């Protein structure tokens, strides 16, 4: 099998250092693969550091990764900077605009539920902030994904927190939205069942979204939905992790899907395993905790904690989490018609798949 992609533990780069690129995305550029994401190496819940820039890794086989360092550095000195490390900035997503020949990076400020953009002449930077914080289509934004069609049109999919998924058309330069948008995947029960973290991919002319429920860093069941067009009404197909009895998407949250450029029908789901230290906690318990917490019944939750003697405390629902220990779950997607399945693999290789 040769080199393999391994799941179930921390990833190390070619120098043996722990990899830090959460909200992972992969780009294929000039014959190489580039994995990038939020650098959480100092985000242990006690430092006040939410992020330490955007880190990138390079690979020729998707199995071993060379650390290229920070392509977007934190601004340590200016507390008003959008890139100040104490600011709740996350979820980088980079897209190339053929017309402008610019690389465009979108990010969000989690606490303000606003987006901002940066641009660069090179994938590797330097990136320059090109907008202030804004509400896309005057809507609050949570986790998101970017995509472009074969004719060069760009779209953003984002969760309007606790209510629905929004698909908005990007401006020609990809640094904003035109104001045209649709909504889909509404969930009447809200938290913890409302959908977030949309990961888009396109296959055989159909558009797919993999989404998660709403339990913060704690994992939950995924859903996959399909549409005939980018801005269409997405129809839910079910949980792609149907073989996972824990109902936690293998203790992870899918962040993006990468289509291998040289392998036949190989789509790779990249997921964050935010809290490997809490994998023993049952979804059915914290699902109910989040439901109670969201509906502002905190006293009921505190009484329940005291009565049931749970191992984890209410503070674990806050942002004070040690996500410097976050890992990855990276798995191939299997298709049977419209059916989408993600099965657990301890180790696997892209070489198992036929060349195109």
Predicted regions: what is each one?
Residues 1-356:
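Carbohydrate-active catalytic/glycan-binding domains of CAZyme proteins
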